[in-house]
């Protein structure tokens, strides 16, 4: 909190309510100001509906992937699903495995499921190749990696192994050939959403298979459009994708002209209505899907893992991702209180003691996701997979308890590493003045480098790198602070790495121990160049509130409007409220003073919480009569009861 340079307080909430003529003034105000929501119809923000999802058939190579899966299953050939160890990799692998095991079209499939180990380098490394060859699959499906590993895929195809890659990571100039590469980031991808996780890609593949097996597959529709000059144009729709006549002819030429009848298309269903305004493609695809018996019923349960992957892989909660998360929350709530097929996931919800009246985005990001991720971090990814694929209630209960114990081990390891980090910077305070905060010690423990790097960013308000020894080498994580692209920095230092990769916001690498001093020596100069070239990097740490409120305005009425904009996360941050000239009363230290709970004059019974800065706040309050604060509302479920509380992100002198 003491690192904040500037706080900008937004408009008075009361003035916004007065000026905006709408039943939902908060929604209308924020939609117009949040970049990721600007082009979304407000009605679409309020629903969780399959109609808002795009057709999967604009994903590159999706048709080839379906054909390979169907043909290899029908021939009783071995299919190996190989997923990454993180939550998205586990979620995507289990989602697809569940479907393939349960659908009759794959009843003859010889299916094996495998996930990478914490000790393995990322992706199709030497160790992974060895495991794959030992398994002897006819068809390999990689989940959450593979886009940048053309050489390794060439090697596998020469061994007679066909490959499908489901991945959402950055795609290099040279992409793998001889395989079905389903990645929305491909330069030739026409899919409207680029930032979707691999669990969503698994969902898309499942929905595409169900559609492919229906009578609606390759059913052509047409519509006549008249432009402003009165000229008519016939548009064609195939499997949810719009084509001109020329594009349709090209498709026929590329395939077999006899495989697609264009002579008698069905008319576009102009009279068909949906809950929200949709573009022609989504509207027609939804219309077709509704005609398929049990289509949405089969897909409903698949949304849970798609939502978990979306949240835990920190995808932007705009566009289609919003709908996946909202659908997942509904599905998980039904799973919790009902008798659904995912016994393992249900037992995990029960062990976590979540609110049975409604699973929340916070539950996905702070409870479910970390537990699934912990297995991979602690070198026990297979335990998370075994839980999610549990077939009996007794097995599920045992595995859920085991996974929670693994997560507790992860917490203890993280705490030990953070204690070492604090001692490290106490000895070497100059390290915190560099452009990138960096920490490596030989006694650091592996598996939690991403968590530690994130906490370093939170503490020092700078990009951070944390490295720990791992199986004879070392592995590191880098996290961004602002909009800077950390992959650019890693690329400039790539000569020191064994492997590296990731996203613009978060990356990872492996490095030989003897290369670490050379890496350290080069890091500062490379970081200076990197940040000097990054014009988007903030020059100061700024907190901006969406609204300034009076204490008496913060309550259940505001919470109801607040929920219109959920789910909150990347791309759609929680609504920040500012309160000025607040007066704190009834201070209650918690956990030996580490945290603090209090009320403020005028807010009634609403509890205000400050985490990890309890002593600092109490010292501050001993000198100040009133103060300004910034934070967000939160519903807290504890011991069977739900209460509203205000989580304080920042506090400071009034008027600062």
What do the predicted segments below correspond to?
Residues 142, 164-166, 170-216, 291-315, ...:
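Conserved phosphate-handling catalytic cores of large alpha/beta enzymes
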Residues 439, 597-602, 609, 646-649:
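Short, acidic/hydrophobic/Gly-rich beta-strand patch recurrent on exposed beta strands
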Residues 8-139, 159-160, 211-243, 249, ...:
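Hydrophobic helix-and-loop "lid/oligomerization" segment in the mid-to-C-terminal part
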Residues 515-520, 626-656:
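OB-fold single-stranded nucleic acid-binding module
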């Amino acid at each position: 909190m003491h690192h904040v340079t500037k706080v900008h307080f937004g408009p008075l909430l009361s003035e916004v309510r007065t000026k905006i003529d709408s039943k939902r003034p908060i929604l209308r105000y924020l939609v117009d100001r949040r970049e990721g929501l600007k082009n979304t119809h407000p009605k679409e923000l309020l629903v969780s509906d399959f109609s808002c999802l795009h057709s999967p058939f604009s994903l590159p190579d999706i048709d080839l992937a379906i054909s390979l899966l169907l043909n290899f299953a029908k021939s009783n050939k071995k299919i190996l699903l190989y997923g990454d160890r993180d939550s998205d990799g586990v979620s995507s692998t289990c989602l697809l495995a569940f479907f393939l095991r349960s659908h009759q079209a794959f009843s003859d499939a010889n299916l094996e499921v495998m996930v990478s180990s914490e000790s393995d380098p990322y992706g199709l490394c030497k160790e992974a190749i060895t495991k794959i060859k030992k398994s002897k699959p006819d068809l390999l499906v990689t989940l959450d990696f593979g886009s940048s590993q053309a050489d390794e895929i060439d090697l596998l195809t020469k061994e007679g192994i066909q490959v499908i890659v489901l991945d959402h990571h950055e795609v290099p100039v040279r992409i793998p050939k001889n395989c079905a590469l389903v990645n929305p980031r491909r330069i030739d991808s026409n899919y409207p959403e680029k930032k979707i996780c691999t669990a969503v890609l698994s969902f898309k593949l499942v929905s595409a298979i169900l559609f492919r097996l229906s009578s609606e597959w390759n059913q052509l529709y047409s519509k006549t459009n008249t432009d402003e000059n009165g000229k008519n144009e016939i548009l064609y729709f195939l499997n949810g994708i719009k084509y001109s006549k020329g594009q349709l002819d090209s498709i026929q030429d590329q395939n077999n002209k006899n495989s697609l009848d264009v002579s008698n298309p069905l008319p576009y269903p102009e009279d068909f209505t949906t809950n929200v305004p949709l573009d022609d493609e989504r509207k027609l695809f939804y219309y077709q899907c509704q005609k398929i018996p049990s289509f949405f019923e089969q897909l409903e349960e698949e949304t849970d893992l798609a939502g978990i992957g979306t949240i835990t892989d920190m995808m932007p909660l705009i566009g289609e991702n919003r709908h996946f998360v909202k659908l997942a929350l509904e599905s998980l709530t039904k799973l919790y209180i009902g008798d659904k097929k995912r016994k393992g996931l249900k037992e995990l919800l029960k062990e976590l003691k979540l609110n049975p009246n409604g699973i929340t985005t916070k539950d996905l990001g702070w409870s479910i996701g970390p537990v699934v991720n912990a297995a991979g971090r602690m070198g026990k990814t297979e335990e998370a997979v075994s839980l999610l694929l549990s077939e009996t209630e007794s097995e599920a209960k045992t595995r859920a308890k085991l996974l929670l114990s693994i997560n507790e081990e992860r917490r203890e390891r993280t705490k030990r590493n953070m204690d070492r980090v604090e001692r490290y910077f106490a000895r070497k305070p100059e390290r915190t003045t560099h452009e990138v905060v960096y920490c490596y010690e030989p006694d650091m423990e592996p598996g939690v480098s991403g968590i530690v790097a994130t906490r370093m960013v939170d503490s020092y308000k700078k990009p951070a790198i944390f490295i720990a020894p791992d199986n004879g080498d070392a592995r590191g994580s880098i996290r961004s602070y602002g909009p800077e692209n950390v992959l650019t920095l890693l690329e400039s230092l790539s000569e020191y790495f064994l492997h590296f990769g990731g996203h613009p916001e978060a990356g990872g690498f492996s490095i030989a121990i003897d290369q670490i001093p050379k890496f350290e020596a080069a890091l500062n100069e490379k970081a200076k160049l990197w940040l000097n070239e990054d014009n988007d990097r903030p020059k100061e740490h700024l907190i901006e509130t969406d609204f300034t409120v009076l204490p008496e305005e913060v309550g259940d009425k505001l919470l109801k409007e607040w929920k219109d904009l959920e789910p909150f996360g990347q791309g759609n941050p929680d609504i920040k409220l500012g309160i000025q000239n607040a007066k704190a009363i009834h201070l209650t230290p918690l956990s030996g003073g580490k945290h603090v709970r209090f009320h403020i004059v005028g807010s009634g019974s609403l509890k205000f919480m400050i985490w990890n800065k309890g002593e600092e706040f109490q010292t501050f309050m001993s000198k100040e009569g009133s103060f300004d604060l910034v934070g967000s509302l939160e519903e807290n479920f504890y011991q069977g009861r739900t209460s509203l509380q205000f989580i304080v992100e920042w506090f400071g002198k009034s008027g600062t």
